[in-house]
Structures are given as structure tokens and as C-alpha cells.
Amino acid sequence: MNSDETEILERSDYISFATRKRSGDWVNTPVWFAPDEGSYYVFSAGEAGKVKRLRNFRESRIATCTMNGKLTGDWYDTHAYVLDEPRDQQIALAALRKKYGWQMRLADFFSRLTGKMGRRAYIRIDP
């Protein structure tokens, strides 16, 4: 990605995050994301399919999209990693809270309330 493409991507509220299945097919999911030091961070339920797929295939791709997943930009090839270290997870959470503010804090509140906060997975995406 060049700097103009990066700027357009980072202005978006959502990206379509595509992970690869064993069959080679791609599964697209609209997600919140936050930039930090050249990487992008997302979160998901720990048992979600995208998390399981990333354990097998680090290849991924991202594109800007609407909240409902309708693509609004081009695909970019990336590599993604599930973050297992608490320090790395805190970096991801801080980046997401910085970008989404009260919305992320509200999501955190309900995740704690329902017991899902501890089962969250944080993912780093490297362009």
C-alpha cells in the first residue's frame, strides 16, 4: 500500500477482513480496526471461525467496507496473527479504544457483563 491508500484505509470505520479456508476460499468479515505503528488491530470472539482459520493460514486481505460488509475499496494482501501475549493484547485494546472511544468502551462493558471479555481474541494485521 502506498501512503495515499493507507490514509484512505485508516479513515474508514470498518474493513472487510478476509481469511482463507483450507479449501482456498476466502471468508470476509466486516470488523472495527485500529492502526498502530504500521500494523492494524482487530478483535473477535476467541472461538470465531476467523481466529481458527488464522491459526492455519496467516495470509489474509483487507479492504474498506461499510458496516454491513459492502466493499468500498480495493483488496490489499496482508498477514495476520492472533496475539497470545497479554502485553500485545493490551497494545491492541489501547489502539482500538483510541480510535473508537466511547463505542469501544461500551463494547468492553457489555463484553465484561456477559463474560465474553476474557474469551476475546486480538489480531494484528501487517500490510
Give a label for each model feature.
Residues M1-S16, K70:
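Extreme N-terminal tail/first-helix region
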Residues M1-E7, S39-K50:
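Short charge-dense sequence patches
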